[in-house]
Amino acid sequence: MVYKLVLVDGVEMDLTLDLNEKGFEMFFKPYQIASLDLLWNTDEHLSSRMVWEKVNEMLPGTISRASIINFLNASVENGLLDYIETTGKGGYRRLYTSKLSKPETTKYLSAIVKERLQTL
C-alpha cells in the first residue's frame, strides 16, 4: 500500500506501508534504515559519500550513490534529516545530520499513521 501523507506543515511524504514487516522495516528499505542509523548514531554531519560508503560496508550487495542521495534529500524534505551546505572543489555539497532521534522518529511516524487511520 502506498500512502501520500500530508504533514501539518504541508509537506507530503510518500510512504509504502508493508504490514508484513515490523518497526522501521514497515516504511523503509534496508539501505535507508542503515543510512538513518548512521546519522542517529553520530554527532557529525556526514556527506552523501560518507553515508554511501558506510552503508555499502554494512549491507550485502551494492547500493548506488544516487539511491543514497535521493533518500537523504527526500528525508530532508520530509523533516527527518537536516543539512548544512558547504563549498568544495565541485561546488556546493550537503552534509547531513538527523533532525530527530531514533525514538523521536518512531513517535513521529507513529503519530502520522495513527492520524491517517482515524480518518477511515
Roles of regions detected by a PLM:
Residues 45-55:
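Short acidic, hydrophobic short linear motifs in intrinsically disordered regions
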Residues 103-120:
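Amphipathic alpha-helical dimerization/coiled-coil segments
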